Amino acid sequence: MSSVQENLITNVCQDKAAKPTNKITIVGVGQVGMACAVSVLLKELADELALVDILEDKLKGEVMDLQHGSLFLKTPTIVADKDYSVTANSRIVVVTGGVRQQEGESALNLVQRNVNVFKFIIPQVVKYSPDCIIIVVSNPVDILTYVTWKLSGLPQHRIIGSGTNLDSARFRHLISEKLGVHPSSCHGFILGEHGDTSVAVWSGVNVAGVSLQSLKPEIGTDQDSCNWKEVHKKVVDSAYEVIKLKGYTNWAIGFSVAEIVESITKNLGRVHPVSTMVKGMYGIETEVFLSLPCVLNGNGLTSVISQKLKDDEVGQLQKSSETLWGIQKDLQVL
């Protein structure tokens, strides 16, 4: 007896469905991982989304919840498993797995706990998707991006840390609040470490091409009567504040990661402040990953913009690198 499917559908082509060309995997289905997943789905960036985690019940519940919303999405396949074979042939793998930052805990204090987690995750990712681009989100992101590079054996341009892409978004939001101008029209970068030693590049802050430093040379310094320096302090403190209030951060980092993914999947060539190897730049001679303005396209992180920094900004960037190297040099990575 013929099935309902056989009676309903007449096949014209016997071939199976085409393989996905923009498969995206999210490692970790915690608050950050799911915010990344939802952001990727809503921006319609993937033709297949895979989720992987060691917590089977949580994983099954999350993927069922997303699948039940398939009618409202444009991603035809959403899958999940604790086995990394589900991630096979991913174009982009977003790593959010790891232990969560606690209230008042510096991101750098997380490092050794998360390094041990990555020793399991990264070899599995590369085994099933040797041609993928890896975006590291777990904290401390700069050190874990370095760890991912070492563990994966992949070229530098295919290892990207989410870095200060979110810090810079926070910076632009706070500037926009002070000026009453939309964040997209307030331009400025936070560079260096995603964390306490980040560098606000006040020399480059502008609105419609008008440098704020040209209007107020002391902006961002202790001599500034308008206390713009407080804006950078709020950027540094904001994650701690959100964690104190709601227990974790997730939505803004999810949006930030989806923007990075979009620049790659759509081959946009947009500039993002993301974490990359900075040895040989700005007088830094150690193998550390810090955020600089980078061009992202379909091949990954293809180039770094040589931003003209003032001497004090270079000094802060070097201090940022020294802080990371002080911890990184003693890690047991391999």
Curated annotation (Swiss-Prot):
Q: Which UniProt keywords apply?
A: Cytoplasm, NAD, Oxidoreductase
Species of origin reads Xenopus laevis (African clawed frog)
Where on this chain does substrate bind? 139, 170, 249
What residues form the catalytic site here? 194
Subunit details = Homotetramer.
GO biological process per UniProt: lactate metabolic process; pyruvate metabolic process
Cross-referenced NCBIfam families: L-LDH-NAD
Stored CDD domains: LDH_1
A molecular function annotated in GO for this UniProt entry is:
L-lactate dehydrogenase activity
Q: Which gene encodes it?
A: ldhc
Reactions catalysed, semicolon-separated, are: (S)-lactate + NAD(+) = pyruvate + NADH + H(+)
Report the subcellular localization: Cytoplasm
- Which domain of life, per UniProt? Eukaryota
A Gene Ontology cellular-component term: mitochondrion
**What family is reported?**
Belongs to the LDH/MDH superfamily. LDH family.
Matches recorded under SUPFAM superfamilies: LDH C-terminal domain-like (SSF56327), NAD(P)-binding Rossmann-fold domains (SSF51735)
Q: What is its main location?
A: cytoplasm
Enzyme Commission number: 1.1.1.27
Where does the chain bind NAD(+)? Answer: 30-58, 100, 139
Q: What is this protein called?
A: L-lactate dehydrogenase C chain
Pathway the protein acts in:
Fermentation; pyruvate fermentation to lactate; (S)-lactate from pyruvate: step 1/1
